């Protein structure tokens, strides 16, 4: 049985459709959920994209009802909570891989652009992670003044900007570069440090700092 294989061999030995079956079993007990698991993967392309899909999109798939959506969203929330716990209130700069893992878990599979700001204290501990804006498939509106204002409200000393590219390609646009420069200037004027701007793609990310863009 799938459950026994999962308990003895772990998820690494299971293909995506079988792991998805285990989740679907909870919503649809005593049903053959393999066809639905494969259908979801065909529609959304990957396990991560299935979990991140909006409820309205999920229910367009034949066989998906409220119970299935609920189970998928519980798993998505649990994965994000676990990844977040590995970076919250920890020195971010020395836990960089954990931070990247969290950003990929939270943002890599989203169908539209999302812009987040990670606020750090004087010891570079992550004190807040907030979504600042949501956009379309290729644009998200960001207001530098609001970002800096929020940093002051939180008594933050440094920032890390993060946004995703639903296309999967993390190459920054000219608008991304210009916006980052505006936030950097606004932050520096108030004594705040902009450590980096991460663009999250599918399976990889781009660091403005590493690319010499900061």
Swiss-Prot record:
Induction: Induced about five-fold after UV-irradiation.
Binding site for Zn(2+): 163, 165, 176
Name listed for the protein in its UniProt record: UPF0758 protein
Family, as annotated: Belongs to the UPF0758 family.
Domain MPN positions: 92-214
Pfam families (UniProt xref): RadC, UPF0758_N
Motif, JAMM motif: chain positions: 163-176
Record InterPro entries: MPN, RadC_JAB, RuvA_2-like, UPF0758, UPF0758_CS, UPF0758_N
Gene3D superfamilies reported for this sequence: 5' to 3' exonuclease, C-terminal subdomain, Cytidine Deaminase, domain 2
Organism: Rhodobacter capsulatus
The keyword Calcium is annotated on this UniProt entry: no
């Amino acid at each position: 049985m799938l459950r026994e294989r999962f308990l003895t061999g772990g998820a690494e030995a299971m293909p995506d459709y079988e792991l998805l079956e285990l989740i679907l079993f909870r919503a649809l007990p005593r049903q053959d959920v393999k066809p639905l698991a494969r259908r979801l993967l065909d529609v959304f392309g990957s396990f991560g994209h299935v979990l991140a899909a909006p409820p309205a999109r999920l229910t367009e798939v034949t066989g998906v009802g409220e119970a299935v959506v609920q189970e998928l969203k519980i798993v998505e929330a649990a994965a994000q909570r676990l990844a977040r716990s590995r970076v919250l209130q920890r020195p971010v700069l020395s836990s960089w891989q954990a931070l990247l893992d969290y950003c990929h878990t939270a943002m890599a599979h989203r169908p539209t652009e999302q812009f987040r700001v990670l606020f750090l204290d004087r010891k570079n501990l992550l004190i807040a992670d907030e979504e600042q804006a949501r956009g379309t498939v290729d644009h998200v509106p960001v207001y530098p003044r609001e970002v800096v204002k929020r940093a002051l409200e939180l008594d933050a000393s440094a920032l890390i900007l993060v946004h995703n590219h639903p296309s999967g390609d993390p190459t920054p646009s000219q608008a991304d570069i210009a916006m980052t420069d505006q936030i950097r200037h606004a932050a520096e004027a108030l004594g705040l440090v902009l450590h980096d701007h991460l663009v999250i793609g599918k399976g990889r990310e781009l660091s403005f700092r590493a690319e010499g863009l900061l």
